[in-house]
Amino acid sequence: MTDPDFVAENFEAKRMNEDGTERYSVIAKKMEHYPVDNSAVLEEPRLTHFDPDKGPVSIRANRGVVSSNGETVDFRDAVQVRRAPFGGDPEMTLTTTFLHVVPDKDLVSTDREVTLTHGNSTVKSVGLEFNNKTRQLKLLSNVKGQLQTPQKDGRAALPFGRKH
């Protein structure tokens, strides 16, 4: 890669909804812009997506690469996704080494190993596709996990709904 044409430290960018509310923000310790392909490399990026109906989701990594048109962000190395508990839904976390994000379409995907936790459930897979608009999750291969559904009284049930 050639030298960057500009560098920004403590970088922050925000995307707003039509009503003026914040849709998502991207912050990074450092951003380097490369004119040869109009991409940007981010050091310690964090993207936070704001959705009043689903709660905020944050993505962190050691590095990120923003595409030339700004439509995608590739998070690399020690990728962590977190959605705090929201509206009765338990915390959700995801860890992987690479995550491709299309913020304006609410899409994320990877072809790498992932570990996904949702409350007391844990699933591991190789590859994942997630559409946050439709809440559809596709685990691509080698899926293994333990799913625990909450009982009506709020206690976690044993896997597959067996009584304890």
Predicted regions and their residues:
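Mature-chain termini and adjacent capping regions
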Residues: 1-164
